[in-house]
Amino acid sequence: MTPHPRFKALCERQFSPGEEYVLAVPEFATTASRNHYFAVLHDAWMNLPEEDAKRFPTSEYFRKWLLVKVGFAKENSIVCDSARDAKNLAVTARSLDPYAVIVVSGKIVKIYTAKSQTAASMGKEEFQASKSAVLDLAAEMIGTTRDALAKKAGRAA
């Protein structure tokens, strides 16, 4: 197989001539699965205890926080010259990404950004794994199970 000219340099870095590679067609989660996920997650957000509800003004904030908490996130750690610089960096980071989870510890700033769940960013298996983990934690936060939450959201739809 010959790579498209646009991807030739990338292929030369990632593959060796003469080696055999397995090609696989990526599978994507169905639209129904994605729609169900967002409906169930919205229902969980609507049922958060008051102290948690204040932290998440929208279900999108809630979803991205959950993704970070269950490990579907990118982490950037930055060591600053001082604790004050770290606090200033955290403020700047917050203005650039209001959904990021930012942790300041002394001179170190850790910025966690939720992984995108678009079909182009996550294949079927990874989406299903993230969906299950996110809904498990969301259900735990409202004192129920993922299955019970999904059934309740299904009846409301």
Identify the function of each model-found stretch:
Residues 1-157:
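Acidic (Asp/Glu-rich) sequence patches and key acidic residues
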